[in-house]
Amino acid sequence: MVSMTASSGRRVLLAAPRGYCAGVDRAVIAVEKALEQYGAPIYVRHEIVHNKYVVQTLERKGAIFVERTAEVPEGAIVMFSAHGVAPVVHEEAARGKLATIDATCPLVTKVHKEAVRFANEDFDILLIGHEGHEEVIGTSGEAPEHITLVDGPGDVAKVEVRDPSKVVWLSQTTLSVDETMETVDALKEKFPQLISPPSDDICYATQNRQLAVKQMGEEADLVIVVGSRNSSNSVRLVEVAKLAGARDAYLVDFADEIDEAWLEGVSTVGVTSGASVPEILVEQVLEWLSQRGFEDVEIVKAAEESITFSLPKELRRDLRAEAAALVEQRTGNGPSAE
């Protein structure tokens, strides 16, 4: 075990901003409000956000997370996660007589609308993102015949388009800014007339958290990122920290996952968290470090954030009654249309 004292000059650099973004905050509150208004169970298609603690907490309150719409009983309420879903999922829910709440992050919805717009104009769309990620699946589903996935610079060589003068790039919102631009540069070299999206697709929170980590990584020997392994933006923070100069960087869900061996020879620890991580988990990491002599905490502030999103409009309706009416229509027990 590493021997430490409070006077050893050890310090913590705490990133700001960190943790919940506006889209995650909106989605989590939406589940809590739905449970409060309609009672359990509330079904959620896929994890509402990619964080183990958040999902487990909501499960205890009565949320049931499913991977397929077919797993939701007829007449139930189902919420779509912050990552967004393809149009076919909305169609499945309608066929299943489900009342739906769409908690898709508005910034993801923006990318969906861009995909539809460019598809309607018959562009080839090069979607920069990670294969299999829920957000990529949802966006691709908006225009599957027009979208080609580009999973990093290594994919560029094999990309083919119908007309090099009608090609546009879009991106997953949670990517590394630097890697995305590296991919874009490679695409522009191959397709000089490549069009950029009308506004930046990588979300403000992803960019701000990466900027703070870059500043931190210049001074930190070790960076601890609080986040789950299936969280794209959290994984990217580990990568950014290493590229910024940190000797080591690790991803943990909880403080008890930290290995004391990581602290050998370390005087400065950087701490941040992904956009789907509640602050309580960061506080537990800070307490863990404090108990081992890292009591001096300095804030590394990269940006101010004040963005908020309104809750899904469906939470202003009586969804239980709507779901029951849908089932009655199917069984023929509902009121006559005559």
Swiss-Prot record:
Pfam family, one: LYTB
Protein function: Catalyzes the conversion of 1-hydroxy-2-methyl-2-(E)-butenyl 4-diphosphate (HMBPP) into a mixture of isopentenyl diphosphate (IPP) and dimethylallyl diphosphate (DMAPP). Acts in the terminal step of the DOXP/MEP pathway for isoprenoid precursor biosynthesis.
Textual note on the cofactor: Binds 1 [4Fe-4S] cluster per subunit.
Binding site for dimethylallyl diphosphate: 50, 83, 133, 231-233, 276
Catalytic residues identified in the record: 135 (proton donor)
Entry-linked InterPro entries: LytB/IspH (IPR003451)
MF terms in GO: 4 iron, 4 sulfur cluster binding; 4-hydroxy-3-methylbut-2-enyl diphosphate reductase activity; metal ion binding
CDD domains: lytB_ispH
Organism: Streptomyces avermitilis (strain ATCC 31267 / DSM 46492 / JCM 5070 / NBRC 14893 / NCIMB 12804 / NRRL 8165 / MA-4680)
Gene it is expressed from: ispH
Name of the molecule in the record: 4-hydroxy-3-methylbut-2-enyl diphosphate reductase
Catalytic activity reported: isopentenyl diphosphate + 2 oxidized [2Fe-2S]-[ferredoxin] + H2O = (2E)-4-hydroxy-3-methylbut-2-enyl diphosphate + 2 reduced [2Fe-2S]-[ferredoxin] + 2 H(+); dimethylallyl diphosphate + 2 oxidized [2Fe-2S]-[ferredoxin] + H2O = (2E)-4-hydroxy-3-methylbut-2-enyl diphosphate + 2 reduced [2Fe-2S]-[ferredoxin] + 2 H(+)
